């Protein structure tokens, strides 16, 4: 086993060194990366100094204190985006230059080719990113600006490394699917824009000063980087690289593929409900079970956390605000409740789970699901803190519609997790596009056949039944 691993690493390094050697001999690649990497940290140092002077003058040094690690993150991020062009042309660039045939005809395995390109593609962005961080820190030292604490430094360096791997994995995946360098460069926006949004979220956490959530971001980015690398390895096919000359947007084929998977073998609407939906549920039963288990764990963890920190939570609110919380059907909150409002709100949550899950292999969709389940667990100690019986309120205020709403949430979340699993599973007879379309069709089966009816029933009960039961229970 060790011998096999050593052989794999040697082959991966062989591909990586070939790629790095080509990069290092081209001054048109090296000069812009190094020049921009040195200039940006210099400007960031000047900005940090000006911000510190300005905020100190008006008595708000906390802003400057949080700005220094924020600029450190920015300095680490931008060189990666500049160097991303190397990864974007890793396969398709060689195809246009006519140098890919010898590489693909070698006895190297597909995963060795992909991982070798990934290693070489990550090296340049990380080198320029670390170089920019070093220049930035030297500038801080020369201007007598305090360094960020060790925890923030570690978080920034880890996030920079993981984000580089995540972006390069996506770029190489694009390079294996694109038919030209021009197309791969245009598709780079699907990497840069989401990563820029991620950086904005991390920046909010930095200015907020919550280190625990930043470590959760580290875990999340690690999972996404691993999944995206896995997708690249799972769907890398050297034969497709040689055979694909141009891709035309075939809307008819997309619709036919979707409809064939969505309809299945059903001959009627009744047959579709009777056979296809439950066939899909059976196919996803393990994922559904996992979703139920992690949802229960989220509820228990939230309940324990809220029970242990209930005094701190209550101290945030004034006593009169807690006592004024609406609890009955005659409250202003209850008066605004309507069937369309509740149904639309629940549907919105399901759509958000779908959209976030599509861009994160189900990870962000599962996170929204866990947050919803966590809220259910956390609300019981809070109900007790305001002097209401938690068990009675839960039995009459949540259970009537919850027995329909929670299964709908579980099914929708499990379906989007299954989509992510389908994408990272190797399927030699299916292209990445076919796998994605079929997985979306499976989600739509669950969504239209089960989730939507369950949400409709839950909204009706929550509108007309739950308020009556809750009003009777609290009298």
Language-model segments: which ranges?
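A structural motif at transmembrane helix-loop-helix junctions in multipass membrane proteins
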Residues: 24, 28-31, 90, 145-193, ...
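Hydrophobic alpha-helical transmembrane segments of multi-pass membrane transport/permease proteins
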Residues: 25-51, 70-83, 190-202, 291-301
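Transmembrane helix segments
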Residues: 35, 42-50, 166-219, 223-226
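Interfacial/capping segments of alpha-helical transmembrane domains
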Residues: 48-58, 299, 303-327, 469-472
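Membrane-interfacial helix-loop-helix connectors in multipass membrane proteins
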Residues: 50-67, 134-161, 206-209, 381-396, ...
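Selective transmembrane-helix segments that form parts of the transport pathway or gating/packing helices
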Residues: 78, 83, 108-139, 292, ...
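Transmembrane helix boundary and interhelical loop/hinge segments in multi-pass membrane proteins
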Residues: 84-104
């Amino acid at each position: 086993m060790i011998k096999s691993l050593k052989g794999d690493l040697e082959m991966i390094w062989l591909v990586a060194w070939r790629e790095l050697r080509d990069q290092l001999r081209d001054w048109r690649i090296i000069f812009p990366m190094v020049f921009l990497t040195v200039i940006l940290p210099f400007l960031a140092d000047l900005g940090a100094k000006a911000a510190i002077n300005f905020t100190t003058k008006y008595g708000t040094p906390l802003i400057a204190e949080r700005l220094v690690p924020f600029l450190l993150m920015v300095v680490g991020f931008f060189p990666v985006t500049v160097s991303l062009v190397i990864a974007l042309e890793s396969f398709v660039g060689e195809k246009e230059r006519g140098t890919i045939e010898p590489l693909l005809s070698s006895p190297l395995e597909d995963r060795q080719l992909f991982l070798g390109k990934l290693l070489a593609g990550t090296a340049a962005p990380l080198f320029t990113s670390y170089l920019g961080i070093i220049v930035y820190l030297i500038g801080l030292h020369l201007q007598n600006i305090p360094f960020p604490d060790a925890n923030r430094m570690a978080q920034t360096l880890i996030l920079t490394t993981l984000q580089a791997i995540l972006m390069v994995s996506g770029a190489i995946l694009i390079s294996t699917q694109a038919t030209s360098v021009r197309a791969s460069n245009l598709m780079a926006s699907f990497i840069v824009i989401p990563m820029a949004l991620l950086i904005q979220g991390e920046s909010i956490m930095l200015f907020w000063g919550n280190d625990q959530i930043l470590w959760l971001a580290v875990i999340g980015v690690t999972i996404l980087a691993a999944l995206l690398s896995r997708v690249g390895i799972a769907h890398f096919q050297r034969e497709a690289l040689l055979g694909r000359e141009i891709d035309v947007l075939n809307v008819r084929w997309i619709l036919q593929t979707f409809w064939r998977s969505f309809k299945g073998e059903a001959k009627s609407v009744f047959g579709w409900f009777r056979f296809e939906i439950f066939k899909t549920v059976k196919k996803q039963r393990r994922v559904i079970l996992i979703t139920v288990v992690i949802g229960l764990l989220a509820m228990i963890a939230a309940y324990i956390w809220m029970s242990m920190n209930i005094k701190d939570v209550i101290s945030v609110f004034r006593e009169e605000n807690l006592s004024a919380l609406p609890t009955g059907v005659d409250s202003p909150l209850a008066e605004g409740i309507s069937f369309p409002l509740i149904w639309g709100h629940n549907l919105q949550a399901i759509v958000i789970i779908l959209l976030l899950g599509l861009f994160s292999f189900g990870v962000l969709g599962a996170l929204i699901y866990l947050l919803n389940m966590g809220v259910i667990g956390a609300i019981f100690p809070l109900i007790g803190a305001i002097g209401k019986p938690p068990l009675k309120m839960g039995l009459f205020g949540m259970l009537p519609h919850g027995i329909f709403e929670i299964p709908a949430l579980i099914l929708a979340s499990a379906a989007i997790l299954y989509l992510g699993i389908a994408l990272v599973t190797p399927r030699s007879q299916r292209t990445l596009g076919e796998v994605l379309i079929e997985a979306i069709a499976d989600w739509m089966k669950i969504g239209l056949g089960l989730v939507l009816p369950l949400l409709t029933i839950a909204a009706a009960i929550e509108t007309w039944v739950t308020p009556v039961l809750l009003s009777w229970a609290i009298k």
